[in-house]
Each structure stands twice: as structure tokens, then as C-alpha cells.
Curated annotation (Swiss-Prot):
The keyword ATP-binding applies. This is Tyrosine-protein kinase yes. The gene is yes1. The active site is at residue 399. Residues 161-258 form the SH2 domain. PANTHER family: TYROSINE-PROTEIN KINASE.
Amino acid sequence: MGCVKSKEDKGPTQKYRPDPTNPTPGSHMGLYGPDPTQMGQSPALKGPTNNYNSRSSGLTPFGGSSSVITPFGGASSSFSTVAVNNPFPGVVTGGVTFFVALYDYEARTSDDLSFSKGDRFQIINNTEGDWWEARSINTGQKGYIPSNYVAPADSIQAEEWYFGKMGRKDAERLLLLPGNQRGTFLVRESETTKGAYSLSIRDWDEMKGDNVKHYKIRKLDSGGYYITTRAQFDTLQKLVKHYTEHADGLCYRLTTVCPTVKPQTQGLAKDAWEIPRESLRLELKLGQGCFGEVWMGTWNGTTKVAIKTLKPGTMSPEAFLQEAQIMKKLRHDKLVPLYAVVSEEPIYIVTEYMGKGSLLDFLKEGEGKYLKLPQLVDMAAQIADGMAFIERMNYIHRDLRAANILVGDNLVCKIADFGLARLIEDNEYTARQGAKFPIKWTAPEAALYGRFTIKSDVWSFGILLTELVTKGRVPYPGMVNREVLEQVERGYRMPCPQGCPESLHEMMRLCWKKEPDERPTFEYIQSFLEDYFTATEPQYQPGDNL
């Protein structure tokens, strides 16, 4: 946020045309929040087939879903993108249906219940948000449990191999992690067919090496399931059991369920939003910027968190608290979740702790120095995924750059500090010309006239792409801010960085179109990047002997 000090080839093949049926979002100059011109607009943008502003275009027919919510499965994958009371709508939880724990959980407060994977619960109250009051069948104790850690007993959500609402690309990321063998698999909701599922399997062959095959599991009118018409099953469970015993037309027999990663809880605990400063312990300083510091710390003596401390006067506590209420509802697996706040100055912002730090430091000084283009493009695709969600929610980031992306294990990237830049009251920042303002990342219409929209975020994303491929080099090397502003206004754009494919540079240049509404959507950018190395392959494999 603000000024942070930092310790093959597939291209767009058709001429980019703006879509007259898809107007750009209105300016968000004065307000970070829903765009009143877009309220009621369908999230599925429609447009001509060769339009970069729509991912439903024919240009990327094999694109993964931009609506992935949680990459690591479990019941959390049933959550919507904003706060909900019951992730299992229609399930009676008042003692009629029992729930089973999908993961271990260690109580964080005296009101919580500790439990182990496989424990069973009777739900007493599930109407108060993300933490449910429950009674453990195993111990008889009552307390609160995170609702995304449980699923109805004997349901498909309770199966270890079921990963819920997960996109194709995230399934591939998980299955291709080191340690997984050929035949490792998962089942997820189909992105393209309502009521259907997809089976994703890790495979290997001499030509492609390790890869993932996807099979559509179709539903019969009678209620059964099949991949190939000659092998039909009453339940998904029976289908999975069959293919663990025989490949029977698949690329390989199902051998091992894909290991999952325990999801983040939605918030620290029940009613732990505005928290006392004393409940936080600052332990290790991770970084320092113009407006504050970032620490690794512990909440309530139990939970590791990241804590951003803001210098007094950086922003109004009232405005921040109002903004934070919006930010905590923006839930997506590629956004750093906001856990809690200390709302009196000095303001503290409590978020998930990401072990590898900022993307900028990771590229310059960490393991990122050794990454090759496929990994860098995949990280860019993850960031585009998070920004596509912000785009669908009609919000804007305002300060998108590598310093504001955080990295976790297995090259997971999450977007941080979305929306906070609007609240900064520092004169050197608000003037947009001072040393604290990130001119080199900012679209000209935003830097000169304060016209911040999702399309100015697209411009910033193009700059972020240069940071990725150059391993953290400052944009416009050798140029000062004023010079950058003048040159960009005259039409100057950064040349193709060394080692960067021309097709990727072409995407950067699309992001830097002078007219904001000629820049692509994040939905399109995500699709382009996810399929950068695989655009010639079909999304789903046919089973043999269909």
C-alpha cells in the first residue's frame, strides 16, 4: 500500500476490438465500493466472439474458470464470494443432520471447540455467520466451530476426494505438486455443466512428462453418473471406487486422493472483528514502508497472523473501519483475507500470514530468482484470477504491483492491500506527483486526473508483468517519475524485456492502451495466462470406448 520499501509462445492472434455491448466500469474516483452504473449487471459479460474484453470469446476456448473460490477443497469450496450463513443451503442442521469434521482444529478461544478430522457434530445454531454453535458427539462438549471445516455426514462434501468448486487450473496446480504420483486424483464441480462433476487425474507420458487429464462426469436423468456410457453408477462414490480398481478407459487407475491443505477459517473466531490491541503480540518485523510496518505476530496466544501497523494520521479511523467492513466480505482464494482490525490509532490490520513475503522480495532475494517462465506466468495467472474476482464484484484495487502481492508455499500468490490506497491522507501521496505515489505503476488517466477504475488496475497489471519477467526490476529503468509521466503521455511504452516472449509483451501493450476501455478485462487476461502453454489441448479427455 502506498510506498513500500523492498529489502513458448502463444499470443493474442486476432486484432483487439472494444466491445460496444460491454461498457467499461464507471470511475471510482470518490468511492471504493460498488459501481452504481453496474449494479444489477450480470457477472457473465457477453460480447462478440473476437473481443478481448470478454472471456466468453472464442479466442480462449479452453480457459479455466475465473470464479474459483477456494483452491484447497473441503466444504469451504461451497462458500459464496461474500459472507453467508450456511454453506450447505437446504441442509437441515438443527440436530436432524449430523456433520463431520474435514480437518483438525485447535480452539483459539474459550468459546471454541477443539476437534479432530472425522469427529461428528450436532449443529445447535448455524444462523450467525461463519462460526456455528455445535455439540460434539464424541465428547458431548458445546462450542463454536468454523463452518468451512465441516460437511454433512455421509454427503459427497464429506468425501476426502471431493474438492467442490475448484477450477481446472487450481486442480492442476495441486495435482502437479512435488510428491504426488501418477494416478493421484480429485473430483470437483464441473465449471461448464450445472449438476455435473469433473474427475482430474495426474498422469505421465514420455512426450509431456507429468500432466493432468480431466474427465467430465455426467449425470443421468435417472440420477446415476457416468464418464463413459458403458459404465454407469448409482452414486459418485461407486464411480470413484470402480476407477480405483480398474482404469477402464481412463488414462490411469485412480491410486491416491490428492492431498489437501487446511483452508483458512473465515475470521479468527466468532465475534473477533474489532479486537483489543493487547490480544496481539508483534514478534518479527517483516517490512517497513512510508505509512507503517508489517509484522508477523500472534493473536490471543494461539494464532499466527500478519499485522500491518499504520502510522497515526495515515488515514481516518472512521473511514478505514467503513472500508474494512467491505474488504472483509471480499472472499476469494487469491485475495489475502482480512481477519480483524484494531480501529483506534495506531490502526492495526490483521490478515493471513503468508510465509514467503512480498512477491517483489521473493523475486529479488528469495526463491523467485530461480523461477522459469512457466512458473512466472502461472503466478501472473493467479493474480489475474484474484483481480478478475475484484472486477466481477465491481471494486478496484488502486495500487496493484509486486510489492502488494504476497507469496505462500507452492508459489501460491494472493493480492493484498486492495482498496486501501484511496484512504491515504498524506499530501505527498494524494497529490499523485509526490515521491510516495507509485507513478510508474499508475495509468496516465489515474495519475493525471484521478480517474481510477478497474481499467487503471489493468494498466498496473501490465507493469506488474514486467516485474515478474525481470525478477523485480523497477519499471522504466533509468527514468524518473516526471519523465515517465511525460513520455507515456507521448505514447512511449516499455520495450519487450530480455527473455520475454513477444506474445507476452503484446499482452502488456494491450494493458497499456491509451483508451481505458480498449484494455482487456481481467477475465480475459486470466484465461490468456492460464492457457499460455496449453492452448492447443482439449479441456476434457474422452474416456476410451465412449
